[in-house]
């Protein structure tokens, strides 16, 4: 598939604010089912031997791919002294897990993947031996995966999550983060090590898309706060990770991320959808009028039946364009509403509480 078409699909989904789903419906043919007794830890001598061989080959693959992607790794020193941990990264290439493996070196690493990557063939067997952990549906399957993650981090391993969800090829901007990685870190009392890929253009390819040099930025570990609950730590580490992603983007590209205007796309064909997105881009951005009068709500008449309002869908961080306040303990810039000694959750985002930490 041409990369130009992938970029068009990314622009279409960005305009629809559909940040966490695949660009195309994944194939579910020839998959190995993820059952409640799925062997994530690969018990047995034969499985252990196969895992050792494939993990070594996986590390070698990262070394081979690094010059192809012209990979540069920044912040590798932040991994020193870190035991078992959750690693987060933006998902921008089918091979980015090998590049992350290149960064962590000989440290053993598990990789969480969607169930549609659990192929029932030789390729799937190699991936499983290399450390992939497919996510299954249902409470029993999720508990089994949770137990495997706990065993992995307790054994000193890294577990790689892609909290942005689906793969978007070379997508530069930070996307909304899902909770799973941060809940796992909070529940198991281990740090999150945030990573973020940025790109530098060079040359052009045949379909008009410029080639990319990859840089993998490794942030400082974000440790759970023992004074907070699992839920509060989930929110806290999630927002600090987004803070790192945003600050890394701004430092790499020299400006804040600008997202396409939101449009409601109702077209049936890909060409019509792309045209709708392009037309929305040509429209000037609307600036809200702060002095405009707010509409007054009509009071219901006596005995009038009112239709209940629909429940709003879960909201993601609002990605504010400004209001960057420091989080000096972690060395990152955090998007907040006002300066505080520690950090503040984004107003209108996934949480609305403030935590003050001593510096």
What are these model-derived regions, one by one?
Residues 61-91:
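Helix-to-loop junction immediately C-terminal to a conserved catalytic motif
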Residues 34-45:
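A short, surface-exposed helix-loop junction/capping segment
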Residues 138-142, 174-175:
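A conditional alpha-helix N-cap/helix-loop micro-motif detector
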Residues 64-66, 104, 127, 152, ...:
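A generic structural signal for well-ordered alpha-helical segments
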Residues 47, 51-69, 124, 128:
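Short hydrophobic helices that act as membrane-entry/anchoring signals
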Residues 81-139:
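Catalytic core of membrane glycerolipid acyltransferases/transacylases, capturing the structured
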Residues 2-32, 146-359:
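Non-catalytic C-terminal accessory region of glycerolipid acyltransferases
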Residues 60-61, 129-136, 164-167:
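Short, basic, glycine/proline-bearing loop/turn elements
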